[in-house]
Amino acid sequence: MERLTRWLLVMMAMLLAASGLVWFYNSNHLPVKQVSLKGNLVYSDKKTLGSLAKEYIHGNILRTDINGAQEAYRRYPWIASVMVRRRFPDTVEVVLTERKPVARWGDHALVDGEGNVFEARLDRPGMPVFRGAEGTSAEMLRRYDEFSTVLAKQGLGIKEMTYTARSAWIVVLDNGITVRLGRENEMKRLRLFTEAWQHLLRKNKNRLSYVDMRYKDGFSVRYASDGLPEKESEE
């Protein structure tokens, strides 16, 4: 009998606790009074982020649409990742990680530090431009880093880089000179270019417009006044 009584008391306590939770869930008590946005936000429109919070996060903290808010922030182009969580009794915390743009993707999008393409506006002159097929942005970013390391030793940078449909690489330097590397031995060809630049091409940099490295052991050049490439050391 004593055992049954104890069991009934436990059940009653559980029912009361459950009823209390249901009551709190359906009541206007425990309202959200504060939304805390956290993260190093440089490019995002904070007003827009605040509006997203107001749209989804309101009312009873137990019923507020955490999942909806999370999905809305994920759709915002500048946000790479988001975590939305309740902080009882009255606060919802939104932790945001912002994308860091490293290049332009064509004329209307950007590439972040992970090689992801996203559509957003950014007024920052001097960013390199990537041109390639869909799905090649991560590979282009990797190659950009490799090419830049080699070119930097000669004080050169990349203005634009193209990865063609035939998997060939074309690099436009920050001085306007175009370098064609082709689709094989790209790093070897780029190093050969930097050697030629150091010992031969630099002195004509103001006239030089095009260098074709797609030769076995040499290259061809085109000057601004030329109609056709002038071949050098072609084999």
Swiss-Prot record:
Membrane-topology descriptor: Single-pass type II membrane protein
Coiled coil (UniProt feature): none
Domain POTRA: 30-99
Name of this chain's protein: Cell division protein FtsQ
UniProt keyword annotations, A-Z: Cell cycle, Cell division, Cell inner membrane, Cell membrane, Membrane, Transmembrane, Transmembrane helix
Subunit structure: Part of a complex composed of FtsB, FtsL and FtsQ.
Gene: ftsQ
Segments traversing the membrane: 7-25
Cell division in keyword set: yes
Residue intervals on the Periplasmic side: 26-235
Spans within the Cytoplasmic topological domain: 1-6
Summary of the function given for this chain in its UniProt record: Essential cell division protein. May link together the upstream cell division proteins, which are predominantly cytoplasmic, with the downstream cell division proteins, which are predominantly periplasmic. May control correct divisome assembly.
Superkingdom classification of source: Bacteria
Organism this protein belongs to: Neisseria meningitidis serogroup B (strain ATCC BAA-335 / MC58)
Gene3D superfamilies given in the database record: Cell division protein FtsQ/DivIB, membrane protein fhac
